[in-house]
Every structure is written in C-alpha cells, then in structure tokens.
From Swiss-Prot:
Assigned keywords, A-Z: Heme, Hydrogen peroxide, Iron, Metal-binding, Mitochondrion, Organic radical, Oxidoreductase, Peroxidase, Phosphoprotein, Transit peptide
GO biological process, one term: response to reactive oxygen species
Subunit annotation: Forms a one-to-one complex with cytochrome c.
Protein's recorded name: Cytochrome c peroxidase, mitochondrial
CDD domains associated with the record: ascorbate_peroxidase
C-alpha cells in the first residue's frame, strides 16, 4: 500500500517515457563494465494515495541488483515543453503569491515556498546520490511528515491549484520552481533553473533526519553542508535566505522573525547578525535562541556564523555588499536545487524567468 499524501492528487503522476539509470561508479572508474537500467514509464492517473507504483514495477529489482552503487538521476524533459511553458507555470505561481498575500499575518507564501524548495533539495547525500529534488518524494508521507518539515504543508497546499492547471510538470520541478519564483518575486536575484526532474516511487524517499538541526555550532554546520557538497561561501550565502519569513514555535520550536523585511529578499540577515545586541534566552518551548531588543531572533546555527572566523569574514562581506550576496546566493541555490541530477548534453540551457513586473503583469 502506498502512503503518499492526498493533498495534491496530480503530483503523483510520472512523466511520459522518462528513465532512471543506475550505474556503478566504481566500475566506471576502473573502466570495467557498468550496470545500467532503463525503465520506460506511463503516466499514472491515480492519486498519490491510490495504490499506484507509478509504472515502476521493475525498479525495485534493478535497485536490488545495484544496491551498493550510487544512483544516477538523468534529467528528462517532457516532450514538447519549452521555456514558454515553464514561464507560464512561473507566472501562475507568481500571480497566486500576489493574490494570496494574507498568509502568516501578511508575510505571504513566498518564504514557505523557498523553504519547501530548500528542504526537498536538502535531503541529498553526495555519497550515494539519494534524496534531493529529483524524485519529488516530498509527496510521500515519510518525507511529508518529517518533523523537520513541519509547516511546509502550507506551501504544498498552495501549489495544488498550480499543478491542476499544469498537470504535466513533475513534482520535483514544481517544488523547485516554486522556490525560484518566490525568490525572484520577493525582489531577490535571478535564479537559473533547469527542468527534467522525474517523479520516482515511494521506496526512493530518503529517511528522516537529513535536514539540519538548528541548535548546533559552526562545526556542525560545516560538516552538515559537506554532505551537500557546499563550501563555506555557499553555506553562508544559502543561510542568508533566513531574511525571509519567521520561525513558528509550533513548527520548529523557535519563535520570531529574523528581521523586519521578512517578505523582501535582502542582505538584512547579515546586517542583523553583526549589528543587533543579541542575548541568549530560552523560549516557551525551552529551546535556546538569540533574541534582540528589536524583536528579532537568530537560531544557534545562525549565530554560529559570527563565532567562526571563516564564516564571519563572509558574513561581513555580504553585509557590506548586497550585490555580491545576490550573485553568490543565486549560484548556491541553483546548485542546491540541481544536486544529484545529471543533465544530458542535449538538455535545454538553464531558464532565466522574467518576473511579473518585467512582463508588465
């Protein structure tokens, strides 16, 4: 019995004639024979909770044979789809962001869409290429109900009418495109985005526990991001997205905003880290967080960036140069969304979407 959530029925559909390939990296490195498996799929019309294995009847056999080999996730674009098709999806998300602006006390859905894209990508493990944005596995209960994903259900529900309007887009493409749209529409940098993620079956869902803990120090932060193949600069840049939204006690065990402009993408996160008068306090959940007299907060992992000399120098750089932050964030976020995906040589170049303002909409 499948345990996919039912909130977004059409997200369970797989792309037509897409393939998953499994290769032995060790054998390839040794110039020995490689193991490859390709399984054609047919589009499933059942809901994610409807008992379908999405046309992957033989995938488990292939995976069993290659259980010790890293996966290779090959991007495959839905036939006939072009930049214009994905710009239409972008526009639908952006217009809904504009219209549904009352969410979270008028912060809006932008921050939760960025977090959804981040978390569905942040499960990736470079050692075996499992997890990540490719398979869209957040639609299954194990990932959907991961305690670290509390609150993301709101972003998932937000995307439901978008997917009903564009049923051909894969789950992974929709989740990641939602984050790109949100960043750009909140006046952030352009994020190059590539399509071709493929819905994979439930048994490819990564285990819980792959997302970062908030109560740790800089050594933990550096070690965690090594699994995502991120260097120090990329780490600090990605954490700058905490300028968006706020924490909620019921979801994360922490409470409060990181700054004042919580639905505008800026470098305020770094400015506040350096300039606010921070005090370590326990909140109503008995968790320690850094609070300022301005009413802002920082997670222990946030504050650790100014306790580590290497991170601190980058924090100062971004606080003084928002353009540099935007440039580095764009590259790091693009990398995060694409981790673990192999794009064929004939795949489309990354798309750069126009904002609603640029289109006069």
């Amino acid at each position: 019995m499948t345990t996919a959530v039912r909130l977004l029925p059409s997200l369970g559909r797989t792309a037509h004639k897409r393939s998953l390939y499994l290769f032995s990296a060790a054998a390839a490195a040794a110039a020995a024979a490689t193991f490859a498996y390709s399984q054609s799929q047919k589009r499933s019309s059942s809901s994610p909770g409807g008992g379908s294995n999405h046309g992957w009847n033989n995938w488990g056999k292939a995976a069993a044979l290659a259980s010790t080999t890293p996966l290779v996730h090959v991007a495959s674009v839905e036939k006939g789809r072009s930049y214009e098709d994905f710009q239409k999806v972008y526009n639908a998300i952006a217009l809904k962001l504009r219209e549904d602006d009352e969410y979270d006390n008028y912060i809006g859905y932008g921050p939760v869409l960025v977090r959804l894209a981040w978390h569905t990508s942040g499960t990736w493990d470079k050692h075996d290429n499992t997890g990540g944005s490719y398979g869209g596995t957040y639609r299954f209960k194990k990932e959907f109900n991961d305690p670290s994903n509390a609150g993301l259900q709101n972003g998932f529900k937000f995307l439901e009418p978008i997917h009903k309007e564009f049923p051909w887009i894969s789950s992974g493409d929709l989740f990641s495109l939602g984050g790109v749209t949100a960043v750009q529409e909140m006046q952030g940098p352009k994020i190059p985005w590539r399509c071709g993620r493929v819905d994979t079956p439930e048994d490819t869902t990564p285990d819980n526990g792959r997302l970062p803990d908030a109560d740790k120090d800089a050594d933990y932060v550096r070690t965690f991001f090594q699994r995502l193949n991120m260097n120090d600069r990329e780490v600090v840049a990605l954490m700058g997205a905490h300028a968006l939204g706020k924490t909620h006690l019921k979801n994360s065990g922490y409470e409060g905003p990181w700054g004042a402009a919580n639905n505008v993408f800026t470098n305020e996160f770094y400015l506040n880290l350096l300039n606010e008068d921070w005090k370590l306090e326990k909140n109503d959940a008995n968790n320690e967080q850094w609070d300022s007299k301005s009413g802002y907060m920082m997670l222990p992992t946030d504050y650790s960036l100014i306790q580590d000399p290497k991170y601190l120098s980058i924090v100062k750089e971004y606080a003084n140069d928002q353009d540099k932050f935007f440039k580095d964030f764009s590259k790091a976020f693009e990398k995060l969304l694409e981790n673990g995906i192999t794009f064929p040589k004939d795949a489309p170049s990354p798309f750069i979407f126009k904002t609603l303002e640029e289109q006069g909409l």
